[in-house]
């Protein structure tokens, strides 16, 4: 009868069980084993979480460096290779906007590239070591704000500036087209409404909804990602709370007995 109820006859007598979870295990040993399994699983889960953060930081740094190098190089080539029509009088604000946008675009991407270049080798050195305890040597936890800053500059602000750069480049490239009438003695500049102006306007009309879609998608993506992380953490907290309530109830039952 005592073995069926799993109540030990003598507390000093060890539990006679060859496998965990058998009927011979007394209640106190079961609680102790559950606690040890919980501590061990929490230790491994913390290490797994740290390694997951390490790999995520490494992936973000790699993506930031590649994107920033590509877009900043394109902006520099666009600035150098653009050919201005000397006979056409460009709007002053258009030239100022193009120069400012190109400069800010290159500066933002080079800053993101600088952060990625400085942090990525240290993260790569730790991630290539096949040792679970080497995670503490990685600087990704301390440098997390800088990694997120480089990621945001490269993928959000940098791409928005790149879209604006494309629009301004279309205006500078197409605006002089079919806008100058040359006679033998005079040069007359057409008003707005010619073919080049219409081409630049079409590019702007197309790019504006593209930029809005990009902003909406970015906001939706980050909200979905935050919601996923929140739900996962809530499930883990609920599981820990249920286990705590179960252990507390068993402890109270043991005290009553």
Curated annotation (Swiss-Prot):
Q: Quick one: a GO cellular component term? A: membrane
Q: What residue ranges are annotated as transmembrane?
A: 67-84, 95-115, 149-169, 199-219
- Keywords for this entry? Membrane, Transmembrane, Transmembrane helix
Question: How does it sit in the bilayer?
Answer: Multi-pass membrane protein
Which molecular-function annotations from GO does this UniProt entry contain? store-operated calcium channel activity
Q: Name one GO biological process term.
A: store-operated calcium entry
Q: Does the keyword Transmembrane apply?
A: yes
Places the protein is found: Membrane
User: According to the lineage, what is the superkingdom?
Assistant: Eukaryota
Q: Which InterPro entries match?
A: CRAC_channel, Orai_sf
Query: What Pfam families is this protein classified in?
Result: Orai-1
- What is this protein for, i.e. what is its function? Ca(2+) release-activated Ca(2+)-like (CRAC-like) channel subunit which mediates Ca(2+) influx and increase in Ca(2+)-selective current by synergy with the Ca(2+) sensor, STIM1.
What family is it from?
Belongs to the Orai family.
Specify the protein name: Protein orai-2
């Amino acid at each position: 009868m005592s073995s069926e109820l799993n109540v030990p006859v003598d507390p000093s007598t060890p539990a006679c069980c060859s496998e965990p979870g058998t009927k011979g295990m007394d209640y106190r040993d079961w609680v102790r084993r559950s606690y040890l399994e919980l501590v061990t699983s929490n230790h491994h889960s913390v290490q797994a979480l740290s390694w997951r953060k390490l790999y995520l930081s490494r992936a973000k740094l790699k993506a930031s460096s590649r994107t920033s190098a590509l877009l900043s190089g394109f902006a520099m080539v666009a600035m150098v290779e653009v050919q201005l029509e000397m006979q056409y009088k460009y709007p002053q604000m258009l030239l100022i906007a193009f120069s400012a946008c190109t400069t800010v675009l290159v500066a933002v991407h080079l800053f993101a590239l600088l952060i990625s270049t400085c942090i990525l080798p240290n993260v790569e050195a730790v991630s290539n070591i096949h040792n679970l305890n080497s995670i503490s040597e990685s600087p990704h936890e301390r440098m997390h704000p800088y990694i997120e800053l480089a990621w945001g500059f490269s993928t959000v602000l940098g791409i928005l500036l790149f879209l604006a750069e494309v629009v301004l480049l279309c205006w500078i490239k197409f605006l002089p087209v079919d806008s100058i009438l040359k006679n033998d003695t005079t040069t007359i500049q057409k008003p707005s409404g010619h073919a080049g102006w219409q081409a630049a306007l079409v590019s702007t009309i197309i790019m504006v909804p593209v930029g809005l879609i990009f902003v909406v998608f970015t906001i939706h993506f980050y909200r979905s990602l935050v919601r996923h992380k929140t739900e996962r953490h809530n499930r883990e907290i609920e599981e820990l709370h249920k286990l705590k309530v179960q252990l507390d109830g068993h402890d109270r039952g043991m005290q009553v007995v």
